[in-house]
A protein has these predicted regions:
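Short, acidic, small-residue-rich periplasmic hinge/interaction motif at the N-terminus
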Residues: 83, 90-108, 112-122, 127-130, ...
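Short, acidic Ser/Thr/Gly-rich low-complexity loop/linker segments typical of extracellular
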Residues: 134-145
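Periplasmic N-terminal accessory/gating domains of Gram-negative outer-membrane beta-barrel systems
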Residues: 80, 139, 165, 172-180, ...
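Gram-negative outer-membrane beta-barrel transporters
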Residues: 568-571, 671-673, 695-777
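Outer membrane beta-barrel strand-and-loop segments of large Gram-negative receptors
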Residues: 493, 502-506, 549-562, 641, ...
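Surface-exposed extracellular loop regions of Gram-negative outer-membrane beta-barrel proteins
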Residues: 413, 420, 424, 468, ...
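Face-selective signature of the C-terminal outer-membrane beta-barrel domain
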Residues: 394-413, 435-590, 604-606, 658, ...
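C-terminal beta-signal and adjacent terminal beta-strands/loops
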Residues: 675-676, 763, 771-794, 809-815, ...
Length: 877
């Protein structure tokens, strides 16, 4: 009996051991590739010596699995878990498969809110919020708002904005949070070692590049403040012109040119409203007072779908709303200009205002300086002044609803005078020539923004922006010749006026999801053009003649709709896909409708490296014509018509970024194709022509390609950057240059910019900026003849052979400044001394035929400004 009981116990123990008793420690190899589930089950049964039962309803159709030298039981568990199953032992070596129980989904809690600067209450645009727990990054939008996911457990958060102290916070991921986070201004001294080390550890992850796309740059007010001061003040457009891919005009030339594009291909926005001419002093200064600038964005590769109507760049400048807590102001007086600004609350925490004004007195100073500096190729009678004013009112109805009202005006006048006297045995001749240009911008805008829920921003925008231009040319000659019965006293005067005006009403929606951001919008624009009112008044041989020839004003409409999807994949790849559809109605009942697709990809390579790729297609429905031959430049804005098609641009951009603790490096390339470009026909000038502008222009194609490099030092006493651009830009017009390709005006092969600032301590700071650019191309005449018309017998008509067949000499200039700042109890004051064009290099602004001492005409380059010392004093209270 005892023996029978012992045998029974052994049998029971064997049955309990059961499963896998034949191969308890056997390692198996198995490779299943797209096989049926039953075949996979048979393979495991054969390998493990077991029987597997399951319901067909839980079995997938096809499966794949691979293991090498894996214990049999572990291999089965891995296989079943991969397809959401597990098993249960029923008896012996028999198991039954079943589905894994569904895990309870954890609630997805979010953090949202606004980030602002503590001293003023200004909402911060582009502030970065990083969550160390889930490695997610978010950036504040134009209203300073952000939203991001929280992980379960503790979330360590960092709020960072350049020039402000970073803030760290810890939140539990057990609920939703809505915050208003204040960041404190960092003093002008070098950051403490502790702060630098914290931010250094973060930057090694490379996440501070996560919000950028190919060909984009962001300038905060702190970064602009660290750039060299130009004639006593910092300048946002000057800072942008030192970036790669941006070519500044020689001594001005009315602005900056991006990736081989024309001036009108830059969409310059002030708080989202277009500015048609954003420059003072023919491009030396921007028309934006640096005191009002909060930050600025430059886009030259991928354009978000909400932007359209331009081909080369988007320059979006955000102005300050005004201090929410107390009245503050600043005033500055210098040798060249003075400015004043005032800001503060009208209703505390509800309504704020900001006003500023600036005026130069270059018209009094320049001639005095020029007369004391030897400038052989410059005119001694330059005249110039500029003025600008800003006003902004912001009212917050609640934490969700905000209204902003803005006004802006700028005015410029510049030109030159020349008087020559020639004496010979034949007699005496006196000539007087004067050219002046006057232009200005005026805008009004209203923006209403509303936060719906915690993840949807709605913006309603309305504005009117207007630009006017006037060009005057006067010529007078007195001849007192021996043998003639009477003295000759003739006069001729030309005048051209033109302008453009935009009115827009638009609605924009921005929605934030877990890994996705969606943007939608639509708008209607009314474009009004005054192509040109031309006037000729002459007094020849005591006979007065007056002629007017004008083009009729035109009004066109443009409707646009856009949508954009931004997706973040696994924290390493960001994809932007957008589409914009623009419909343009011309005055001659022609309709143009074009889709404008765009795509951008940004992916992380290693720890600190990012690769960017983007492709875009854009259309532009109006054009800016310039007479860059000889003489002062003049503007003419014209619309697309039935015979003049919109300009089309297709661009491919690619780039590589490397970001380290104190340094960053970038290398980018681009390929760009144009169609339907416009230029004046050879020998044609709209100013002195009595025909419609459409009859004197030619249409053609173009292309640009180039490489851009930038190295930047971002922290420490010494800060700055070096940029280099290699650029090639060509044009092909059937009716120009015999149909052969020719370089564009903006084909400047090599462009170098070095910008640096050194802070000796909290008080003293030294800045320097040096820029070099290859000479611009221009069309040089091979001959000339005098107008045969009796009303205008002194007008010289030039004969051209080729297009842009001559190069100006290279442009280079060094600007330096040193500043001293002292903070007192109730105010701070700053002295700035600087030198513009420190080594007095005479950069050509334009070329002009002038009479020499022998009475012969010769080609001379005209320089706008020689070496210019500057001393300014400013206070902030």
């Amino acid at each position: 009996l005892k023996r029978k009981c012992f045998i029974l116990v052994l049998i029971l123990l064997g049955s309990l051991k059961g499963l896998f008793s034949q191969t308890p420690n056997t390692k198996i190899n198995l490779e299943l590739k797209n096989v049926t589930f039953q075949k996979a089950v048979n393979s495991f049964e054969n390998k493990l010596g077991i029987s597997i039962n399951y319901a067909t309803s839980i079995a997938p159709r096809k499966v794949s699995f691979r293991c090498y030298r894996t214990r049999g039981k572990k291999a089965l568990i891995l296989f079943l878990n991969e397809y959401g199953m597990t098993y249960k032992v029923v008896e012996g070596n028999t198991i039954v498969l079943k589905l894994l129980p569904k895990k309870r989904k954890q609630p997805n809690h979010k953090l949202s809110g606004k980030i602002y600067e503590s001293a003023s209450g200004e909402e911060l645009i582009g502030c970065r919020i990083y969550n160390y727990a889930n490695r997610k990054t978010s950036f504040t939008n134009e209203q300073g708002y952000f939203i991001m996911d929280l992980s379960t457990g503790n979330n360590i958060l960092e709020y960072f904005y350049p020039g402000l102290e970073p803030v760290f916070d810890t939140l539990k991921g057990d609920r939703n949070y809505r915050i208003n986070q204040a960041l404190v201004l960092v003093e002008d001294s070098v950051k403490t070692v502790k702060t630098v080390q914290i931010r250094s550890n973060y930057r090694l992850s490379g996440n501070d590049l996560a919000g950028t796309v190919a060909g984009s740059h962001k300038l905060t007010s702190d970064k602009i403040k660290w750039t060299p001061q130009l004639l006593g003040e910092t300048d946002v457009m000057r800072s942008l012109s030192s970036l790669p891919g941006v070519v500044a005009g020689s001594e001005g030339m009315l602005g900056i040119y991006v990736r081989g594009g024309n001036l009108d291909e830059n969409l310059v926005l002030l708080d989202g409203v277009p500015i048609f001419n954003a420059y003072h002093l023919y491009g030396i200064f921007s028309s934006f007072n640096s005191d009002i600038v909060k930050n600025a964005d430059l886009l030259k590769g991928y354009f978000p779908a909400k932007y359209g109507g331009r081909l080369s760049s988007i320059i979006n400048i955000h102005s300050k709303d005004g201090n929410s807590y107390k009245l503050k102001g600043s005033a500055s007086i210098g040798l060249l200009s003075s400015k004043v600004s005032l800001e503060g609350p009208l209703v505390k925490d509800k309504t704020t205002f900001y006003v500023s004004m600036r005026r130069s007195y270059l018209d009094f100073l320049t001639q005095q300086v020029a007369n004391r500096v030897s400038v052989k190729d410059s005119l001694n009678n330059n005249l110039y002044y500029y003025f600008d004013a800003n006003a902004k009112l912001t009212h917050r109805f609640s934490k969700r609803l905000k209204l902003g009202l803005s006004f802006y005006n700028s005015q410029d006048k510049g030109g030159y005078k020349q008087n020559t006297t020639t004496e010979s045995i034949k007699g005496k001749i006196k000539e007087s020539k004067e050219e002046t240009s006057t232009w200005g911008n005026t805008l009004f805008s209203a923006n209403l923004t509303y936060l719906h829920g915690n993840n949807t921003y709605i913006k309603l925008k309305a504005f009117q922006t207007k630009y006017n231009f006037r060009f005057d040319q006067k010529y007078a000659i007195e001849k007192d010749l021996i043998g003639t019965p009477s003295k000759i006293d003739d006069q001729v005067q030309y005048r051209l006026t033109n302008g453009v005006q935009d009115r827009e009403l638009s609605l924009h929606l921005e929605k934030y999801l877990k890994w996705t951001t969606l943007n939608f919008g639509a708008g209607l624009i009314n474009h009004k053009f005054t192509p040109g009112d031309r006037f000729l008044l002459s007094n020849i041989n005591q006979s007065e003649s007056k002629i007017e020839f004008n083009d009729n004003p035109s009004s066109t409409f443009e409707a646009y709709q856009y949508g954009e999807w931004t997706q973040n994949f696994s924290r390493r790849t960001i994809l932007n896909i957008g589409i914009r559809n623009s419909i343009h109605f011309t005055t001659d009942k022609q309709l143009y409708a074009f889709p404008e697709p765009r795509i951008a990809l940004k992916t992380k390579l290693g720890k600190n490296n990012w690769f960017n790729l983007s492709a875009t297609q854009n259309y532009q429905f109006f054009h800016l014509l310039n007479n860059f031959t000889v003489g002062l430049p003049s503007d003419l804005w014209v619309p697309s018509t039935e015979s003049i098609k919109p300009v089309k641009s297709s661009q491919l951009s690619f780039g590589f970024n490397k970001n380290l603790n104190m340094y960053s490096f970038s290398l980018e390339g681009f390929l760009k194709e144009y169609d339907n470009l416009l230029e004046y026909k050879e020998t044609e000038s709209y100013i002195t022509n009595n025909t419609n502008w459409e009859n004197i222009i030619a249409s053609g194609k173009g292309n640009s390609h180039g490489l851009e490099f930038m190295a930047e030092k971002k922290k420490g006493r010494l800060r700055g950057w070096l940029s280099y651009t290699w650029l090639k830009s060509n044009r092909v017009f059937k009716d120009l240059n015999g149909g052969k390709a020719f370089p564009s005006r903006y084909d400047r092969r090599h462009n170098i910019s070095i910008t640096s600032t050194y802070a000796f301590n909290k008080k003293w700071r030294f800045s320097a900026a040096w820029a070099y650019a290859s000479g611009f191309a221009f069309t040089l005449p091979i001959g000339k003849y005098v107008s045969p018309t009796p009303q205008d017998p002194y007008r010289e008509i030039f004969i051209y052979e080729g297009r842009n067949n001559e190069r100006a000499r290279a442009n280079h200039r060094l600007d330096i400044s040193i500043s001293h700042k002292r903070v007192l109890k109730r105010y701070s004051r700053t002295w700035v001394f600087g030198l513009f064009n420190a080594y007095n290099h005479h950069n050509p602004f334009f070329y002009q035929f002038l009479y020499n001492k022998d009475g012969q005409q010769e080609l001379n380059s005209v320089s706008l400004l020689p070496i210019m010392p500057n001393l300014s004093y400013s206070i902030q209270f």
